[in-house]
Design a protein with these regions (language model features):
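A conserved hydrophobic helix/loop-capping motif in glycosyltransferases and polysaccharide synthases
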Residues: 12-24, 28, 35-36, 45
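Short aromatic/hydrophobic "clamp" motif used to bind/position activated sugar donors
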Residues: 90
Length: 357
């Protein structure tokens, strides 16, 4: 990344990939204009949008930097954005989420206060078209946190308290509980190798990190974030801010939604296998756990594929059982779907739709 001109310390570059985001972008950008951190560069990568995204971006003039490219998907758009960044700190964000006003200031303070931390993320609230879905939603969204006996504290061993003076928006009254936040930090590599719990739109890191781990790999597809985060966690500490710093939008268009499940589950399996190949020593040291991971990911991919291609689903399920020894309720459910005639499955789905209508 040494070929890019870098601004003096203090500038934070926020990188936002955007594809057909004309409806959500204005609120996303407005949330960044309201940040308590004063020195911000907003980079929006228009990833071949076919709606009015370009016109929306043009209306902001020089308040934002726009980079346009043919549609290349999330890995390409993220990589293009971080390559264009001039700030010493880089924050990731999606085109349909909202930053809380203190987000950038809080995360910058974490990276300034603990120099061994290479990546800072945070908890987040979730919302949809109907309103708030959940507060402090990370433990619900990420199984790694939800299953852990002490939540994030089970994954990151050090617990710190950090003062927020100067980070919060001006207010006549600030509750004592809001003056500080808990920050968990530590070596997250082993935990992340088994499944990501770092929410990509909440990430901030130092620009120099890109020289060590590179950018986002297109071969990882929709799971490029997990692949990249695992590489990051292998070289330094991860910090998790307990205070939610992002409002995360849940919608049918995002990659984590049911309509994209086939691609997401296939990409998850591919990245899990890649992580195992990349660190054979860790794979062998934790072989039973990795076998369970891969067996589940195969079965989950089979479940996603079964309505589309039963032969492919059968191959994935066979691999889950024969190669990884995974036999559980999911295995039996997928097997039943494979053996059930397509017309019977369609009739069952129709009855379910009528019942829920």
């Amino acid at each position: 990344m040494s070929g890019v001109s870098v601004s003096p310390p203090g500038l934070i570059s926020v990188v936002i990939p955007a594809y057909n985001a004309q409806q959500s972008l204005p609120a996303t950008l407005d949330s960044l204009f309201s940040q308590t951190w004063p020195n911000i560069e907003i980079i929006v990568v228009d990833d071949g949008s076919t709606d009015n995204t370009a016109a929306v971006l043009a209306s902001y003039g020089d308040r934002i930097r726009t980079v346009r490219q043919p549609n290349g998907g999330l890995p390409s758009a993220r990589s293009t954005g971080v390559a264009a960044a001039r700030g010493q700190l880089i924050a990731l964000m999606d085109a349909d989420d909202l930053c809380l006003p203190e987000r950038l200031a809080v995360q910058a303070r974490v990276l300034q206060q603990w120099t061994d931390v290479v990546l800072c993320c945070s908890d987040f609230n979730a919302f949809n078209e109907q309103g708030v879905v959940g507060l402090a939603y990370a433990s619900h969204y990420y199984a790694s946190i939800g299953r852990a006996s002490k939540g994030v504290q089970s994954l990151l061993e050090r617990v710190e308290r950090m003062d927020l003076t100067g980070c919060l928006p001006a207010s006549p009254v600030v509750a004592e509980s809001d003056r500080q936040t808990t920050v968990y930090r530590g070596n997250a590599y082993r935990a992340i190798a088994h499944g990501n719990f770092v929410h990509p739109p909440t990430i901030m890191f130092r620009r120099e990190l890109l020289d060590t781990v590179g950018t986002f790999d297109a071969d990882a597809g929709s799971m490029c974030d997990w692949d990249w985060i695992a590489r990051v966690a292998a070289v330094g500490q991860v910090a998790f801010v307990e205070r939610p710093l992002l409002e995360y939008r849940l919608s049918a268009t995002q990659m984590s939604s049911p309509r994209h499940r086939i691609k997401a589950s296939t990409d998850t399996l591919r990245v899990a296998e890649r992580i195992c190949r990349r660190d054979e020593a860790l794979y062998l040291a934790e072989l039973p756990r990795f076998r369970a991971d891969l067996g589940f990911f195969c079965a989950d991919a089979a479940d996603a594929e079964v309505d589309n291609d039963k032969w492919k689903a059968a191959q994935l399920l066979s691999r889950s059982v024969v190669r990884f020894g995974c036999v559980d309720a999911l295995t039996l459910r997928v097997l039943l779907k494979i053996l059930t005639p397509a017309w019977a499955l369609a009739a069952k789905r129709h009855r379910r739709a009528l019942h829920t209508a």
